[in-house]
C-alpha cells in the first residue's frame, strides 16, 4: 500500500501492454459473472476469485482453507489465495485481445493525436480503423504512396496487378505497424526544419504535430501504446454486483461492457482458429474495436451502447466525468463520520463562543469518548459494557457526557457554504429538545434565519484538529469578514431596535432637566420612577465634566469598554457596527466578543421593554399626497398635449413623463417622512436599520410609484395608490411583473453565482502565501476609482493595509506621511495614514501588489499586505487564493442579473451586475464594445457621407481615422488630448485590445476598476487585493512568438517564470532567447492551463485533460490544494504546509549537522527563498560551523 506522505509528485502516462500484464493478477477468459445457483463467482470470469482474491476474509473458494492461520496459502484445489477480501478492491485482471484495437481517446480526441503523429486526417484514420479502407504500409516498387487509402476494389486490382510486391492492411493492426515505424527523433528534426520554411496553415499544422512528437519524445511513451493488445479489467469491488431484495441482481454498467468485449474477443479467437473467411473475421474485428470503444468512452463515436430502457451505459470515462464522476463526487466531496444535522433555533442566552447541542445528538456524536471515559472512571468494566450503558442511556452517562464535551469544540456548518465563515467552531452546551441553538450574531456570517434552516455539526477528533478549531475557527475569533475587514458579527434586528430605543431622547419626558451628581444617582432615580428612560438629564462624570445625556445612554454605556469613551448619541445599526469595529481595532478579540454579548443582552431586553410593534394606525398617509398627485397629473397632461401636437417626440415624452412621476414620488416620500413622528413604530424600525427601509415605508403609506415591465423598461403609468389604501385591478396587474421578475432573477442568480465561485476557486486555489519577501522592485500606482463625477472607491480604502513603495510627503505642509524607514521595513499603512494621505490631496501612491509579486507558486507577505480577517500581518501558509475567490463569489448572489434598459434609447445596453463580472473574469469580448484609441494625439470629429468619424492626429503629424458605428455615443470632444487606450465612444472596452495597446499594466488597472465598479454600485465592498489575486492568475501565461534557441514551441502557452528560466538557460549557452507576448486568459481557460493535471481534470473537460496529460507524461507537483485533497494528503496550506509539519526536536547543546538540515527542510523548501532573513543568517552560521 502506498504511504501517503512520502511522495511529492504524481505522474501519468500511457501503459504499455507489458506493463498491463505486469499489473494484472490473471487473465479473464469468460464473460460469466456469478453462478446463478450458488451465487459464487465463476472461475476465469469477471469476478473470478482466483484472479481477484477471495470474496470472504481468509477463506478460499472451495472452502478447503478457512481461518487466518492459512494466511498467504494458495489452495491446491481452487487456486485461490487465502487473504483479506479487501484485495478485491486492488487487484487488476486483463483480457488478451485476439486483434489489436485503438484507444478511442487518442484517435477521437480533438486534435486527434494519432492523426497528428501519422499526418493523417481523423476521417481517413477512422476509415482504416473501422475496416472501410485499406492503407498502404509498404509501397514496394509500385506507384502507390505510403499511407495511401485504397477501397476494397482498388486493393483487389492492385493485388492482381502487382501480386505481393506491396503491403496494405486495415484495422488497428495496420495503424500499429505504421506507429512502430515512427522515429521520433528524426520526425522532430524534420518538423523543426519545416517550421522554418513554411507559413500560414501549414505552419500551424507543423507546430501542432511537433507538440505531439515532443510530448512522446520527452515522456518516454511509445506511439504504438495508443493501440491496445491487452485490455485491463478493473477490480471487481469497483464494479460490484449486488443482490436486491427481490432476488434480482443489480450490476455496474461496466460489467455489461466488459462482457461484450470478452464475448466478441472469444468469438474472434474461434473464427481465427477455424480459418473463417476474411470478411467475417473483419466484421468481428470491427465489432471488437467498437466494444472496446464503448468500454472506454461510450457514445464518443457512433451511437452509444444502451442498456434496458434505452439508457446509455456508463463507461470508464463517464465514471470520471462531471458532477457525479469520481473526481467531484468521491474525491473532492466525501461524506464524513461523526456528524449530525438538525433544525436551528435562536439561542439568545448563549455566549459568542457557544452553541446549544441537543442531548441525544451529543451523546451519539461523542459516543466513543463517552465509552472510554465510562471505562476510565470505573462505571463500566470494558468497552462492550460501556457501549451497552450508552445505548440504554443510564443516568450516569449524562454526567460523563457533560465532562467529555467541556472544552471540546464542535464545528457548525450551514449549506451553502459560500465563504469560510460558513463553517465555524463553538463550544457545545447541552440543551433539551432536538434543535441546535445558535448565537444570534453569527447568523449574518452563515446567512441563516430561523424559518426552518438546518445546520450540520462535525466533531474534530484529534488533539490537533481540536486546537485548530479552537484557535482558528472559534466564532469569537472570526469577528471580521475576510472580504473587506469589517465586522461580520454585529447587532441586527431586535438588538438594533433595542439599542436605538434605549439611546433616543424625547422632549418633555418625566424628569427632564434634572441634574445628578453621578450615574448611580441617575439610575436610582430611574429605578424609583422619578425620571424616564429617554428624558434629557445632566450627569457629572467621574472626571468632573457635566454631560447632558439620558438614563438610557447611561445603561447602554455600561457594556461599552471604557477605552472607547462615553457614547452619547442615538445608536442605529451603522453606529453599532462602528463601535464594534473600533473595539476590535483597539482592544482585540476577547473584548469585542464581550461587547457583542453585552449589546445583545441589552438590545433584547429593551426591545422587549419598548414593546415596539406595528399596526395599521402606525401608517399615516400624508395630507399633501392628493395635491402633489394632482399637480403631477396636470404636468403630464400638458406633455401629452404637446406630444399630440407633434412638438416633442415619443422618446422625449416618455423621458419627461417618467421624470415627472419620479419627482412626484420623491415629494410624497418627503411629505410622508415629515408627517411621521420620530417615535412612530414603523419609522423607528426603518431609521434604526433594524428592518425595512424608507422605500418600503413609501410603498405602505406614500405611493408605490413607477414599475418596470418584464423586459426591464419602465412603464410610464405609475401606481398612485399605496398598500394602506389598496391597489386597483390594473395597478395590481402592473405590479405582478416586478414581483415575478424578482423571484425568477433570484433563482437564476444563485446558480450563476455558484458557478462563478467554482471557477474562481479553481483558478486561484494554488495561490498561497509562501515567503516573506519576493524582492520585487515593481508595484502598482493606485488612485481613487471614479465613475464620471462620483467616486466609486476612495484612495484611503485602496491604501489601508498595503505596503508602500515610496515616501509620501504632504504637498503643502511638507509633513512626512510615509517615512523611508516604513518603506524599507515593508510596514503596512494604517487606517490613519491612509486617511491622512487622502486628506492631503495626494492623487496617487505606489504600493506593493500581488499582481507584480515575483514568488513562483503563490505570493509573498509584503505584496499581499495585511490579513483582513484578523487585521494583523498575513501568515505564511495562508490560502489567500481561496479567500479571494470566496470574497468575490459570496456577494455574487446580491448582484443584479439585469441588463439595464434605458427606456428605448438607441445603442447597445451595457451589461451590469453578475453577467458583467463574469464577462470581465472570463475576458470575453463585451457586448456594446467601445472604440479604443491606439495612440496618443488630439481629436477631430468629422461627418462623412452621413457617418461620423473620429480622427486622431499624432504628435508626429500622422493621422488615424476611426469610423463610429451608428447609434454609438461619442465620449471625446473636438480638440481634446487623449492617450493610447482611452475610450472614444461609450461602452465597455475589449480587454484583449487593451492588452495590445497598453500592455499588462493597463489591463490590470482596467479589470480591477471595472470589477470594483460593479460591486460598489450594488453597495458591496470588496478589498482590491482579492480581485488582484484573480487578475494575476489571468495574466500568468505568455504566448511564444519566436522560439530562438530554446526548446520552446512557437504558439505555445507557457508560464512567465518558466519562460524567463528557459531564456536564461539559452542566453547562458550563448543562444538567442525566445520572444513572447503576454496573453490574458479567462478564468476557465486559466484553470485548464494549470500545471496540475489533477486539478484541471477535476474542473472541466476531464477526458481531454487526461488524454493530453498522459501523452505528455505529465508530472503533477502537488502544489495546489485540490490535487492534494484528491490523493488524500494534507493540503499544503496553513498547518499542513511542510515547513510547519517537519518539526524535529534536537537536543540542546548538540551541534547542528548538515544532515539535520536535510531532515528539517524537505526537498522543495531547501530553496533559500523560503527562509526569512533571520533564518538565512542562522543557517549560514550553522553551515560555517
UniProtKB/Swiss-Prot annotation:
Zn(2+) 1 binds at residues 60, 62, 75, 78. It catalyses: RNA(n) + a ribonucleoside 5'-triphosphate = RNA(n+1) + diphosphate. Mg(2+) binds at residues 449, 451, 453. Keywords: DNA-directed RNA polymerase, Magnesium, Metal-binding, Nucleotidyltransferase, Transcription, Transferase, Zinc. It holds the Pfam family RNA_pol_Rpb1_5. Its EC number is 2.7.7.6. Binds 1 Mg(2+) ion per subunit. InterPro entries: DNA-dir_RpoC_beta_prime, DNA-dir_RpoC_beta_prime_bact, RNA_pol_asu, RNA_pol_N, RNA_pol_Rpb1_1, RNA_pol_Rpb1_3, RNA_pol_Rpb1_3_sf, RNA_pol_Rpb1_4. Its cofactor is Mg(2+); Zn(2+). GO terms for molecular function: DNA binding; DNA-directed RNA polymerase activity; magnesium ion binding; zinc ion binding. Zn(2+) 2 binds at residues 774, 853, 860, 863. GO terms for biological process: DNA-templated transcription. GO terms for cellular component: DNA-directed RNA polymerase complex. Coiled coil: none annotated. It comes from the Bacteria. Belongs to the RNA polymerase beta' chain family. The RNAP catalytic core consists of 2 alpha, 1 beta, 1 beta' and 1 omega subunit. When a sigma factor is associated with the core the holoenzyme is formed, which can initiate transcription. DNA-dependent RNA polymerase catalyzes the transcription of DNA into RNA using the four ribonucleoside triphosphates as substrates. HAMAP family: RNApol_bact_RpoC. This is DNA-directed RNA polymerase subunit beta'. The lineage of its organism: Bacteria, Bacillati, Bacillota, Clostridia, Eubacteriales. The gene is rpoC.
